[in-house]
Amino acid sequence: MTVVPENFVPGLDGVVAFTTEIAEPDKDGGALRYRGVDIEDLVSQRVTFGDVWALLVDGNFGSGLPPAEPFPLPIHSGDVRVDVQAGLAMLAPIWGYAPLLDIDDATARQQLARASVMALSYVAQSARGIYQPAVPQRIIDECSTVTARFMTRWQGEPDPRHIEAIDAYWVSAAEHGMNASTFTARVIASTGADVAAALSGAIGAMSGPLHGGAPARVLPMLDEVERAGDARSVVKGILDRGEKLMGFGHRVYRAEDPRARVLRAAAERLGAPRYEVAVAVEQAALSELRERRPDRAIETNVEFWAAVVLDFARVPANMMPAMFTCGRTAGWCAHILEQKRLGKLVRPSAIYVGPGPRSPESVDGWERVLTTA
């Protein structure tokens, strides 16, 4: 049996797997830049998600996302994540997507753009459900941005402020380095699989509550503060019970999560009704955390203000992970292309720590094997 090195850390924590030109989370400075451009500049200047997709994938604003094709969602399971994951995987046989190994970069880019807008369309169709009539395509075609088309396909007549809120959220969520779902997308892409398989696999990774479900878990805390009227007592109660304070702390940033800063400003600018209670909770939480853990810098993370912005845009809690998926398609596509160009299979190793050599007779249950043979 191999001896485990003393400095071994499971889960690839701290291991550098790739170099990338796509995004730079500045952990010490509290900034996030897409190909060198700060997300605060993108959101404050109302750059739409479709254009940010192009920035991440192409490195310029030349050619954003095209409109989604009027293609019906092929499955309605009642779960938005399942619907979009299955729908994307089915694009490969429907549209004849070849393996990444067998196509050039331009074709891969075109397929990724086509699949990305279909992911947005599938989320909107799934959320609207089968008990409401579909929004006529001619109305969707009148929309000027990909985000407006998404909101119209889902809600019919969305509030323009809600469209702006979703744009701000998607731009903030579009890319964040080597997280679990992005790594999954790159691993699948490294095998030469088709783009739909890589995107579908990334959605599967994001379905885990440790990655994509945190914004929805902030809302009950805001609800409780609105009922109690005392943010500090609610926060103290959560911490006294040993529960996790949702929306605070991040594995990457030592300073404030820049995405939280961007979305806080968006919530204030758009007049989100829960902005004031969210500010009260944030201030109470930060004060309490600093008193209890003066040796640790625990700041607000993106999930806290994402919950406020998404709630303002009338996104139900069970749909929030799917909205994260929509935004992150941009980063996934950029990394899939980057991995294709790298052309190297991702194949880490593992240290075996199981039993040493032994006979089958020495394994518990061998007698039952004999009786059924």
Curated annotation (Swiss-Prot):
Its EC number is 2.3.3.16. It catalyses: oxaloacetate + acetyl-CoA + H2O = citrate + CoA + H(+). The keyword Transferase applies. One of its GO terms (biological process) is tricarboxylic acid cycle. Pfam families: Citrate_synt. The modification N-acetylthreonine is found at residue 2. InterPro entries: Citrate_synth-like_lrg_a-sub, Citrate_synth-like_sm_a-sub, Citrate_synthase, Citrate_synthase_AS, Citrate_synthase_sf. GO terms for molecular function: citrate (Si)-synthase activity. Citrate synthase is found in nearly all cells capable of oxidative metabolism. NCBIfam families: PRK12350.1. This is Putative citrate synthase 2. It comes from Mycobacterium tuberculosis (strain ATCC 25618 / H37Rv). The gene is citA.
